[in-house]
Design a protein with these regions (language model features):
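Non-transmembrane "mature" sequence context
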Residues: 1-63
Length: 63
Protein backbone atom coordinates (compact mmCIF):
# COMPACT_ATOMS: atom_id res chain seq x y z
CA UNK A 1 0.00 0.00 0.00
CA UNK A 2 2.71 2.50 0.92
CA UNK A 3 4.56 1.96 -2.35
CA UNK A 4 1.34 2.81 -4.18
CA UNK A 5 0.89 5.96 -2.12
CA UNK A 6 4.51 6.98 -2.64
CA UNK A 7 4.21 6.41 -6.38
CA UNK A 8 1.18 8.71 -6.48
CA UNK A 9 2.81 11.35 -4.27
CA UNK A 10 6.01 11.18 -6.28
CA UNK A 11 4.13 12.76 -9.19
CA UNK A 12 3.54 15.81 -7.01
CA UNK A 13 7.17 15.85 -5.87
CA UNK A 14 8.41 15.76 -9.47
CA UNK A 15 6.03 18.58 -10.34
CA UNK A 16 7.27 20.69 -7.44
CA UNK A 17 11.03 20.06 -7.44
CA UNK A 18 11.69 18.35 -10.79
CA UNK A 19 12.61 14.81 -11.63
CA UNK A 20 16.33 15.35 -11.01
CA UNK A 21 15.68 16.38 -7.40
CA UNK A 22 12.76 14.15 -6.44
CA UNK A 23 14.79 11.35 -4.84
CA UNK A 24 16.84 13.87 -2.85
CA UNK A 25 13.60 15.45 -1.59
CA UNK A 26 12.34 12.09 -0.32
CA UNK A 27 15.62 11.42 1.51
CA UNK A 28 16.37 14.87 2.96
CA UNK A 29 15.42 16.00 6.46
CA UNK A 30 12.55 18.48 6.30
CA UNK A 31 11.73 21.11 8.93
CA UNK A 32 8.03 20.64 8.21
CA UNK A 33 8.39 17.05 9.44
CA UNK A 34 10.51 17.79 12.54
CA UNK A 35 13.70 17.06 10.58
CA UNK A 36 12.54 13.60 9.54
CA UNK A 37 12.73 12.66 5.89
CA UNK A 38 9.50 12.30 3.94
CA UNK A 39 10.46 8.64 3.42
CA UNK A 40 10.42 8.13 7.19
CA UNK A 41 6.81 9.32 7.29
CA UNK A 42 5.60 6.94 4.59
CA UNK A 43 4.00 4.58 7.11
CA UNK A 44 0.38 3.53 7.32
CA UNK A 45 -0.16 5.96 10.20
CA UNK A 46 1.69 9.06 8.98
CA UNK A 47 1.84 9.12 5.19
CA UNK A 48 -1.05 11.60 5.07
CA UNK A 49 1.25 14.24 6.61
CA UNK A 50 3.39 14.04 3.48
CA UNK A 51 0.31 14.07 1.25
CA UNK A 52 -1.13 17.13 2.98
CA UNK A 53 2.20 18.98 2.79
CA UNK A 54 2.55 18.29 -0.93
CA UNK A 55 -1.05 19.18 -1.72
CA UNK A 56 -0.71 22.46 0.19
CA UNK A 57 2.37 23.44 -1.82
CA UNK A 58 1.03 22.11 -5.12
CA UNK A 59 -1.90 24.49 -4.83
CA UNK A 60 0.32 27.50 -4.13
CA UNK A 61 0.26 27.45 -0.34
CA UNK A 62 2.89 29.46 1.47
CA UNK A 63 5.20 28.26 4.19
Amino acid sequence: MMSVNKKILDRLVVGLVGGAHAEAWWNSPNRAFDMKTPNELMTEETWTEVRDYLMHHAYGGGS
